[in-house]
Amino acid sequence: VIGGDECNINEHRSLALVY
C-alpha cells in the first residue's frame, strides 16, 4: 500500500476481499 494511510489500507482490504 503506497503511503500507508489507514484509509488506503481499508480500501486495499476491500479489494483483497474481492480478489
Swiss-Prot record:
Residues 1-19 form the Peptidase S1 domain. Inhibited by PMSF, but not by hirudin. GO terms for biological process: proteolysis. Keywords: Blood coagulation cascade activating toxin, Glycoprotein, Hemostasis impairing toxin, Hydrolase, Protease, Secreted, Serine protease, Toxin. GO terms for cellular component: extracellular region. One of its GO terms (molecular function) is serine-type peptidase activity. Expressed by the venom gland. N-glycosylated. Its EC number is 3.4.21.-. Coiled coil: none annotated. Monomer. Belongs to the peptidase S1 family. Snake venom subfamily. Thrombin-like snake venom serine protease. Causes the specific clotting of fibrinogen (FGA) with release of fibrinopeptide A. The aberrant fibrinogen is then incapable of being cross-linked, forming easily dispersible clots. This is Thrombin-like enzyme TL-BJ 1. It comes from Bothrops jararaca.
